Amino acid sequence: MAGKRTERSMEERKMDRNNGGSKSKAPNGANAQTGATPMASPAVQAVAASGSSKGAPLFVAADPDLVAKKGVAQDSWFVISHLMSGSDRLDLLIHYIRLTPPQGDVIQAMVSVLDPVSGKSISEERDYKVSETTFSTASLDVQTPSGGLSGDASAMHVTGRFQRIDVDLMLAQQGPLLANLGTGLLPFYGDINYEYALPSMKTTGSIVVDGKAYQVAGVSWFDRQWGQMAPSFWAHMQWSWMGISLDNGDRISLWDIIDGDKEHAFATLLHPDGRHEIVDVEPLAKDATSIWKSAATGHRYPTHWVVSIPMLKARLRVEPLVREQEVVSPIGVNKYEGASKVAGQMEGKPVTGHAVVELVGDWN
């Protein structure tokens, strides 16, 4: 990116919507760190066959790439919901992922919700053996003992069955697909990942928190990521990710990846008309403050960020709705998943919105 602000044309964006979109950028479709060119999946080949011959190549497609992937080290389906039930606000995160940590393959089911009654975050993560779950490679059908996902982008059924939280939601795509870094390729700790988002999915259904039922409606950000992990991943992993939804309709997917002495901070801005802008971000660590220490794990996390994007003349203050939003992991991959509020300036205009901030790694 090297200080560039990249904007794709409306013609190319229309092609993206027709073909399911695109994401993440490495030069000429290659791994920016290794030079290897990723092998195209059947979904990618379908996009290439029917897509535009101009502009950046597309490596993801919304519906075809919902299915589970064979031969990858991680396969993730991530839902962030901003919901209302009457005057009650519920911020929900539900995540299903296949991982290959050093101790062997594991399936993680995770949920986190801000309880409208107590105002506190309730979260739970459960881990399963592969044999206890099913992941279809023919259609979206991810099932674990704690729930799963099925359907397609126009009618996605998301369920969760946890000790204190039950989730039953229907999601429907509205608006364009967000393609991180323009093609769908995300250089990630020396290897290649694929990633895209449907950041404005109409959402209805029910959530039960500690026995209290809520009929809910609102908007969800669905994020899909899969790919390989370099051998060094588990030793080096440390990142901040933000999914920012602004009230003006803009959506921002922001990564700040720390890999040893290297830090790569960048964002993809999606406008309501489908235009994408790829921009550099000032590293988040220097403006991250208000450290919170978890009583459960002893981990320390920043809980106040200033997002500075010079190319957009943007300065956004991001603060969690409550500080205590750690998700404790049975396999030790503890993380912070903070439902947050956003306010600031962009392109000379005031903006507000909401976000989720994910912190993974050692923040002590």
Task: Name these PLM-found stretches.
Residues G3-R5, E11-N18, K25, G29, ...:
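Structured soluble/peripheral alpha/beta segments that form catalytic or ligand/cofactor-binding pockets
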